[in-house]
Amino acid sequence: MVTPHGILLLTITAAASLLWITFAEITIPNDAKSFENFLKEHGPGKPGPLGYFNSIYMAFTREEAENFPNLVSVHTRMKRIKTQNSTIPDKYVILGIQAPNDTQEQNSTRNKRDSESYTATTQSGTCSTTIGGLQRLCEVCPARTDLGPDITPRFINEVLCDVPGLDCGVGQVGGKCRSASVFQDFLRFSSSDSNLEVYSQEIRVCCECALALS
């Protein structure tokens, strides 16, 4: 005869076993190839503006993140990409990226998924008013962001405004310094069922002077 205590013990044991199986069946991508394969199978089917994975902007481990290039001080091998909230058609960023064929369509799809807020961002180098040999209207700073252990890739390489919202402009045309971003498909553990899910992660790639046109 099974007592109520025995039934409770069996229930807890079964639940623990199911939880173990759930985690055991999850293979967390920890390299570029497995990450790309996971996104191709479970994601929207299209690479982001930086490709599926880009080691210049993304890293799985802290050791990899420590080898991020300084996006402000690197002046060579530049290429154009579209940014999500830019008032300028193109922004210059470091080579190694893939320009999207249909940015508006991709951004519309990605914005339907929640964007993860920044967890811990630290400045990783000296700020500058020049990038790519060009004089900037806003001072830009290299930074590294740790998104936390539930996110993969965990680390991102970014470019930030030294003083967000600082006045800038040309002649009589004024503006404000603000970050421009791209959105990439990343993975995180779902809080509801402990499964990996695809979500849209913002990566700040430049600081621009947004002019107030009137």
Curated annotation (Swiss-Prot):
Organism this protein belongs to: Acropora millepora
Keywords: Secreted, Signal
Signal sequence bounds: 1-24
Disordered, as annotated region: 99-121
Tissue note: Component of the acid-insoluble and acid-soluble organic matrix of the aragonitic skeleton (at protein level).
Compositionally biased spans, kind Polar residues: 100-109
Major location category of this protein: secreted
Compartmental location: Secreted
InterPro entries: Cystine-knot_cytokine (IPR029034)
GO CC annotations on file: extracellular region
Official protein name in the record: Uncharacterized skeletal organic matrix protein 8
